[in-house]
Regions:
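Acidic, Ser/Thr-interspersed intrinsically disordered low-complexity regions
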Residues: 424-431
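Alpha/propeptide regions of enzymes that mature by internal proteolysis
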Residues: 1-387
Length: 431
């Protein structure tokens, strides 16, 4: 049996842009991630308030620990709104992020928000008097298939633990933190993350995605574009599955590209395309909610300036980020599946791990096709961020090295030039 590995280690073709050092949202400088995982009680009958408990909290700190005073540009997108991210309307209205982002189960949003508010008031006693009030950003998914969700077992201590555990570097994935009880396409999933480092010709920016993945049905699962779910659904049709809920997904996008709020809103929309790549169709009862931020511009809470200047990546230069965020989202979801192990919980419900051996065999069977169109992710030896243009055809459609004044505004392509007259054909009269 294959050990649990990340999706990239299965040799999957996961896009043309390279990941960052850790292939995680923490590759964006200053972003920290921490978890608090709660697993109590043996699998068995549900006893509300007692267990079994399979839940937790994940904390994303956008610029280490000072997001309240050094706010960042923020944005969001809601594909289907049968879910919740508290504080999201303010992020969209102001275009600013001013609290950490926390992820947990549906019925613990209030407790986590209250705990985060308490922590921030301790750190900044002027909140509510000297400073504005805050609305912590807390996202949720329903983990009730495995967890005693009505018992509301997440406490302030767990929020503090997740914040204290937040660090840079590799991010634990799968059944950890807020993802402890989450399921994707009828397999155990949870937290997953991935990143992309753009080549210097596209700005050299880093972009990372972290998901709490909890959506879908097995037959819809696609891995690197392959209908793996249909294959596995037939082989595993004897296994019980979650039937009363389609689930949801919360995604967090971070980048060091200098994007303004309207651009972050647009970037978040492309995350939804990445979610669709793995098999989501955003069902009636699901919630696909995306929050994004850029670390490139800090908006200080205290300043004597009336006008504050911010850097801006021109809209016609954003396309590579759109492509990269789709790739990173797809890989983050697959990483959540690849990392998670089987779990049992409420009422003895069992959720299997994604069978990596079967996935590998399915992918290997199609490898001759991949070999004709793409390299596997680890074949290129050029360091991330230093690659030439990914392919010659791209330069023909879009000259990234042209000065902004040399391109048509919204289209981002060179102004047309009059073609040179063809050389005279001395033999033309002889035909």
């Amino acid at each position: 049996m294959t050990a649990r590995v990340r999706a990239r280690e299965l040799g999957l073709p996961l896009g043309r842009f390279k990941p960052g050092k850790h292939n995680a949202i923490t590759d964006v400088a200053g972003v920290l991630v921490g978890h608090s995982t709660i697993i109590r009680g043996e699998p068995g009958p549900l006893t509300p308030g007692v267990g079994p408990v399979r839940t937790g909290v994940t904390a994303i700190l956008p610029n280490e620990s000072n997001i309240f005073m050094d706010r960042l540009a923020g944005g969001a997108f809601v594909l289907n709104g049968a879910g919740e991210v508290s504080g999201l309307t303010q992020v969209v209205e102001w275009g600013l992020l001013e609290t950490p982002i926390l992820l947990t189960n549906t019925m613990s949003v209030g407790a986590v928000s209250d705990a985060m508010a308490r922590v921030m008031v301790e750190q900044y006693p002027g909140i509510g008097s000297e400073h504005d009030v805050i609305i912590p950003v807390v996202g949720e998914c329903d983990d009730s298939y495995l967890n005693d969700i009505s018992g509301r077992h997440v406490t302030e201590a767990h929020v503090r633990e997740a914040l204290a555990n937040a660090k840079s570097g590799p991010v634990p994935e799968g059944s950890v933190g807020g993802g402890t009880g989450m399921i994707t396409c009828d397999f155990k999933a949870g937290i997953g993350t991935s990143s992309r480092k753009l080549p210097q010709v596209f700005g050299g920016y880093t972009l990372g995605v972290l998901v709490m993945s909890n959506f879908g049905k097995m037959h819809n699962l696609r891995v690197a574009g392959l209908p793996v779910g249909e294959f596995l659904a037939e082989k595993l049709k004897h296994l019980p599955r979650r039937m009363n809920s389609y689930g949801s997904i919360i995604a967090v996008v971070a980048t060091d590209a200098p994007l303004l709020p309207h651009q972050l809103n647009r970037l978040c929309k492309r995350v939804a395309l990445g979610i669709g790549r793995v098999g989501s169709y955003a069902a009636h009862g699901s919630g696909e909610i995306i929050v994004g931020f850029s670390t490139a511009n800090v908006v200080p809470r205290r300043t004597r300036k009336m006008v504050y200047k911010m850097k801006l990546l021109l809209d016609q230069r954003v396309d590579p980020l759109y492509e990269a965020v789709m790739e990173a989202t797809e890989e983050a979801i697959l990483n959540s599946l690849c990392a998670a192990t089987s779990m049992s919980g409420v009422d003895g419900h069992e959720v299997p791990a994604l069978p990596l051996d079967e996935v590998r065999r399915f992918v290997d069977a199609t490898r001759p096709i991949f070999a004709t169109v793409n390299k596997t992710p680890d074949e290129a030896a050029v360091p991330a961020g230093q690659e030439p243009l990914p392919d010659d055809s791209l330069q023909a459609e879009f000259d990234w090295r042209a000065k902004p004044s040399d391109v048509r505004s919204a289209e981002g392509i060179p102004f047309p030039t009059r073609p040179a007259a063809p050389p005279a054909d001395d033999d033309a009269d002889d035909e």
